[in-house]
A protein has these predicted regions:
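Glycine-rich phosphate-binding loops that contact phosphosugars or nucleotide phosphates
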Residues: 95, 131-132
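All-alpha helical catalytic cores of prenyl diphosphate-utilizing isoprenoid enzymes
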Residues: 52-56, 119-120, 134-225, 231
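Hydrophobic packing residues in well-ordered alpha-helices of helical domains and bundles
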Residues: 15, 19, 26, 30, ...
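Hydrophobic faces of stable alpha-helices that mediate helix-helix packing
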Residues: 30-34, 86, 93, 123, ...
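C-terminal helix-coil-helix/basic helical segment that borders enzyme active sites and/or dimer interfaces
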Residues: 67-71, 192-199, 219, 223, ...
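Alpha-helical phosphate/pyrophosphate-handling elements in metalloenzyme active cores
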Residues: 44-88, 125-128, 170-208, 244-246, ...
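Divalent-cation-assisted or electrostatically stabilized phosphate/pyrophosphate-binding catalytic cores
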Residues: 51, 103-125, 167-181, 225-251, ...
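Conserved N-terminal diphosphate/IPP-binding helix and adjacent helical/loop segment
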Residues: 1-88, 92-111, 159-167, 226-227, ...
């Protein structure tokens, strides 16, 4: 395999690449997370199916890489499990709010069992996350996860408050990204560093988490339903103002005059957003955040830990390429 192809594979599958870099100890930790997630979710069918649907497990990976040289395995595993449970809970709740039929190629809990069951399933995963982390006996870690959970909820409320509002600024949008998405990346870094007695990586987590959300919003405009689990332009139809739309309204006078409540053909509007260059501009902004996060990694990191974090950042960027 050529060097370029190897680099591409590493960035597109950071879990596998970092597993090779971190050795058997890291692979054992990731396997322990999967085992514990299945144990916790076994009590309820919808919860278990949510966990079994899988995912990249980027947030647990961040916990482990942030605490890569830490002496203890069990506290790191519990922290990683707690973060992934919170993430899974938010996905279940998001599917209720979006009335999403698919998640990771499978029917959502909402589509299969309805709003009440999906809401209860998300609540269960949330509560089990805090129970898991409490076993570490660290008030500092519980505060970090609580702050992230509060931020997630605040971000959702800000998004609802801003619905259909064409005056949403880039600054307000980015703050919403930090609350709704990046706060959990930030918490993963803080929990890993706390359990592993490592350098503070919260700024790294916040930057790549914000980039992750921007790129996800780009994908809503450009991506097919087979990849996203929802129709193109779902954010438009929900009245959710994202960076591609904000930038497109500045570039295209027709989009600047668009009444969001009067959209008949979301696909056509998406095409106009793409044609304006707004999706590419939004993507470049996200990639700038990724590059900045890598450039600002603390000097005291070891070469293995630094490379692992760079791989995670590259994986976020390439996932949406």
């Amino acid at each position: 395999m050529t060097g370029g192809a190897s680099k591409l594979r590493s960035a597109s599958d950071p879990v596998a690449a970092i597993g090779e870099l971190g050795g058997e100890r890291l692979r054992e930790r990731m396997r322990a997370v999967e085992t514990r997630l299945l144990e916790i979710s076994a009590c309820h069918g919808d919860a278990r199916r949510t966990i079994e649907a899988g995912g990249k497990r980027l947030r647990p990976l961040l916990v482990f890489v942030a605490g890569l040289d830490g002496p203890a395995d069990a506290p790191l595993v519990r922290a990683a499990v707690a973060v992934e449970l919170i993430h899974s809970a938010t996905l279940v709740h998001d599917d209720v709010l979006d009335a999403a039929p698919l998640r990771r190629g499978r029917p959502t809990v909402y589509a299969r069992a309805g709003r009440v069951a999906a809401t209860a399933t998300g609540d269960l995963l949330f509560s089990r996350a805090f129970a898991e982390l409490a076993a570490n006996g660290s008030v500092e870690q519980l505060r970090a996860l609580s702050a992230a959970s509060t931020a997630l909820s605040e971000g959702e409320l800000v998004q609802r408050a801003d619905a259909w509002n064409p005056g949403v600024t880039i600054e307000r949008y980015l703050r919403r990204c930090e609350l709704k998405t990046a706060s959990l990346f930030e918490a993963a870094c803080k929990l890993g560093a706390a359990a592993g007695e490592s350098a503070d990586l919260r700024g790294f987590g916040l930057a790549i988490g914000t980039a992750f959300q921007i790129l996800d919003d780009v994908l809503d405009v450009t991506g097919p339903v087979e990849r996203t689990g929802k129709a193109r332009g779902t954010d438009l139809l929900d009245g959710t103002v994202t960076l591609p739309l904000i930038l497109a309204r500045e570039r295209d006078p027709r989009l600047g005059r668009l009444d969001l409540r009067a959209i008949d053909d979301a696909g056509e509007v998406c095409d106009r957003i793409v044609a304006s260059g707004a999706t590419e501009a939004a993507r470049e902004r996200a990639l700038g955040l990724v590059a900045g996060a890598k450039a600002k990694l603390p000097d005291e990191l070891g070469p293995g830990q630094r490379r692992a974090l760079e791989l995670i950042a590259d994986g976020v960027a390439l996932r949406f390429a």
